[in-house]
Regions:
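Short, conserved beta-strand element in jelly-roll/cupin
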Residues: 46-50, 61-77, 117-119
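A short, N-terminal "cap"/entry segment at the start of jelly-roll beta-barrel domains
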Residues: 1-41, 125-155
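Short acidic-glycine-tyrosine-enriched beta hairpin
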Residues: 80-96
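A generic structural motif
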Residues: 65, 72-74, 81, 99, ...
Length: 155
């Protein structure tokens, strides 16, 4: 199995979220590992959350499973049922089609690092707490389907 050199993969903090929903993820830095490794059936990202940053808005995927492994530090997992601290070595999973909106918040004074994997068919999804959804085409829309203005989107 080929070793992946993280330092050789660009680390970015881009987001496609329309304002003001982009503000909470400004301290989220990620590397897209799947494209760099030639993987095409599922996504893998190495993510660093700076103190105070969110991994995303609280969301779910209609057609994609997600699996997360916390590598370093800790973050608060926020889901419909409440808040749970995830520490290094702990995992979380969300099956496709579950509308249990989730995200991580780094409420500590140190960076936290995790790897998240997703697989399935991108058929869109939604956001629990805000007037936002995403389509299979990768665009953001209001819950009523009205598009948001186009913003920067990660490659």
């Amino acid at each position: 199995m080929p070793r992946i050199d993280l330092e050789a993969i660009e680390q970015v903090n881009r987001t496609g979220y329309p304002p003001p929903f982009n503000e909470q993820v400004q301290g989220r830095w990620y590397r897209r590992l799947a494209p760099a490794a030639g993987l095409t059936d599922f996504g893998v990202s190495h993510v660093v959350l700076k103190p105070g940053a969110w991994s995303s808005q609280r969301h779910w995927h209609n057609g994609e499973d997600e699996f997360l492994v916390m590598l370093e530090g800790e973050a608060v997992l926020v889901e419909d049922a409440g808040r749970t601290i995830l520490r290094a070595g702990e995992c979380a999973a969300w099956p496709k089609g579950s509308t249990n909106g989730h995200h991580l918040c780094n409420e500590s004074d140190e960076d936290c690092t995790f790897v998240v994997m997703s697989g399935g068919t991108n058929t869109g999804g939604g956001y629990s707490d805000i007037d936002l959804a995403f389509t299979a085409e990768g665009t953001f829309v209001h819950r009523d389907g009205t598009p948001y203005p186009k913003t920067e989107r990660p490659a």
